[in-house]
Swiss-Prot record:
Residues 1-37, 102-111, 175-199, 273-292 are extracellular. The lineage of its organism: Eukaryota, Metazoa, Chordata, Craniata, Vertebrata. G-protein coupled receptor expressed in lymphocytes that acts as a chemotactic receptor for B-cells, T-cells, splenic dendritic cells, monocytes/macrophages and astrocytes. Receptor for oxysterol 7-alpha,25-dihydroxycholesterol (7-alpha,25-OHC) and other related oxysterols. Mediates cell positioning and movement of a number of cells by binding the 7-alpha,25-OHC ligand that forms a chemotactic gradient. Binding of 7-alpha,25-OHC mediates the correct localization of B-cells during humoral immune responses. This is G-protein coupled receptor 183. Keywords: Adaptive immunity, Cell membrane, Disulfide bond, G-protein coupled receptor, Glycoprotein, Immunity, Membrane, Receptor, Transducer, Transmembrane, Transmembrane helix. PROSITE patterns: G_PROTEIN_RECEP_F1_1, G_PROTEIN_RECEP_F1_2. It comes from Salmo salar. The gene is gpr183. InterPro entries: GP183-like, GPCR_Rhodpsn, GPCR_Rhodpsn_7TM. Its main location: membrane. Residues 64-83, 134-155, 223-248, 318-366 are cytoplasmic.
């Protein structure tokens, strides 16, 4: 009952002027809650529905190909699973933002949601990195490192990725995740809650290096060399150049790289610059407030990646695109049939005949 009362009546707060209530506590960190409690839940609702539907569709298409699985499909399947698990952690975060950065569900549940959130975010980063290395080996070094593309070895690599991410994120369970603010709001998974942790600046700089620095360099290097190789192959083979296949592949590579950089760079650069400043001097309340607001924006941008991946699959994979269009055509056909059953008999027959004529004419064109 107490939890329900807290859900229904979150604490109210005024917006004080930028100041400190004592030498250590900044009271202006959440002054933006007035518009954040509207915009952030709206944004995350879109990410949740688009991400869940898109990735569920991707998993539905990948799953029947398990018998013909290869290294790329296996990495893609793990990436899809990480995106689905990530989106499933969003509803409680949506409630948290809708209540104006108030978490009434306790420390334990906050830690569980936080752990799921970070595990699947960085699992996704690592599987995108694996995909870039896999493509690099397939095109640039197909014979020398072919063993790394064997399905039996790739399975071990996937298990290793999950274990690595788990080891990187499990320390979160030993850190404080919630904090009661002076205005009565209880925050969850916010940066200021981690400030009391000893050497937090060094920990986060190391996390940025391992979780973002190594993957982004690997992805950009692999895809840059891959693009050069494809250009050279296109120049050497006039048929390939005329068909435009190389240009399409290069376009997809650039798109994947751009999405990764745009989604993940702002958050990690923002975190890195503040931690470096924190090592040099003690930022004041105004700087901490600006950093906190920027974190909320850059985290939104980072989380957008989970619902962009299915669109990349659509344009990058011919088989995926074909199957999606088949499913959509099937749904349209079912909708026509349902509509016809609800109409008078004569009109229903006219629609059915018209639909058959359309399908037959389409088949003749093909």
């Amino acid at each position: 009952m107490q939890v329900m009362r807290t859900f229904n009546q979150p604490p109210t707060s005024s917006h004080p002027t930028p100041t400190l209530n004592d030498s250590d506590t900044c009271i202006t960190l959440y002054n933006h809650r007035g518009y954040a409690r509207v915009l952030m839940p709206l944004f995350y609702c879109i990410v949740f529905f688009v991400g869940l539907l898109g990735n569920a569709l991707a998993f539905h298409i990948i799953r029947p190909n398990v018998k013909k699985i290869n290294s790329t499909t296996l990495y893609s399947a793990n990436l899809v699973i990480s995106d689905i698990l990530f989106t499933l952690s969003l509803p409680l975060r949506i409630i948290y933002y809708a209540l104006g950065f108030h978490w009434p569900l306790g420390e334990t549940l906050c830690k569980i949601v936080g752990l799921i959130f970070y595990i699947n975010t960085y699992a996704g980063v690592n599987f995108m990195t694996c995909l870039s290395v896999d493509r690099f080996i397939a095109v640039v070094l197909p014979l020398r490192f072919a063993r790394f593309r064997k399905v039996s070895n790739v399975r071990y690599i996937c298990v290793g990725v999950w274990l690595l991410v788990l080891m990187q994120t499990l320390p979160l369970l030993s850190m404080p995740m919630t904090n009661e603010e002076p205005d009565g709001f209880i925050t969850c998974m916010e940066y200021p809650n981690f400030e009391p942790v000893p050497n937090i600046s060094y920990i986060l700089i190391g996390a940025v290096f391992l979780g973002y620095g190594v993957p982004v360099v690997t992805i950009l290097v692999c895809y840059s060399i891959l693009c050069c190789k494809l250009r050279l192959a296109a120049k050497a083979n006039q048929l390939t150049d005329k068909s435009g296949r190389s240009q399409k592949a290069i376009g997809v590579i650039c798109c994947v790289s751009l999405v990764f950089v745009v989604c993940f760079s702002p958050y990690h650069i923002d975190l890195l610059q503040y931690m470096i400043r924190k090592l040099i001097y003690t930022p004041d309340c105004a700087e901490l407030t600006a950093f906190q607001i920027s974190l909320h924006f850059t985290v939104c941008l980072m989380n957008l990646n989970s619902c962009l991946d299915p669109f990349i699959y659509f344009f990058a994979c011919k088989g995926y695109k074909t199957k999606v269009l088949k499913i959509l055509k099937r749904q349209v056909s079912v909708s026509f049939s349902s509509a016809a059953r609800t109409l008078p008999e004569g009109l229903s027959r006219d629609i059915s005949d018209g639909n058959k004529i359309h399908l037959n004419s389409t088949r003749h064109k093909e």
